[in-house]
Swiss-Prot record:
Occurs in many kinds of cells as a complex with monomeric actin in a 1:1 ratio. SUPFAM superfamilies: Profilin (actin-binding protein) (SSF55770). This is Profilin. It is found in: Cytoplasm, Cytoskeleton. Its main location: cytoplasm. Keywords: Actin-binding, Cytoplasm, Cytoskeleton. It comes from Schizosaccharomyces pombe (strain 972 / ATCC 24843).
Length: 127
């Protein structure tokens, strides 16, 4: 399956996530993204750096696609953020970072479960 297919099928295809991307763990490239979910080089570098020191994300927040999210969880492989009733789930694997945005109609736990499950699968196949 291509990286774009993971975004389109495994994330957006659930109907719970409305925008998503997969970026390199090094923060140097976007591997796949949904239409209109434009992550700048500075944003993905900042996100990748946040996984080196997750607690630092509580001070800076998460800036993605021009929006600043308040960090509500930052530990291990997962960084979660919230902006009013919508939010962002970021999960790192060995080689990539999954970024899922959920709308106010999706519960945060639903979006986290979907994104974490895809991360588990990718880890299991060596990514």
């Amino acid at each position: 399956m291509s990286w774009q297919a993971y975004v389109d099928t495994s994330l957006l295809g659930t109907g719970k996530i409305d925008r998503a991307a997969i970026v390199s763990r090094a923060g140097d490239s976007v591997w796949a993204a949904s239409a209109g979910f434009n992550l700048s080089p500075q944003e993905i570098q900042g996100l990748a750096a946040g996984f080196q020191d997750p607690p630092s994300m509580f001070g800076t927040g998460i800036i993605l696609a021009g929006q600043k999210y308040i960090t509500i969880r930052a530990e291990g492989r997962s960084i979660y953020g919230k902006l009013q009733k919508e939010g962002i789930i970021c999960v790192a694997t060995k080689l990539c970072i999954l970024v899922s945005h959920y709308p106010e109609t999706t519960l945060p736990g639903e979006a986290a479960k979907i994104t974490e499950a895809l991360a588990d699968y990718l880890v299991g196949v060596g990514y």
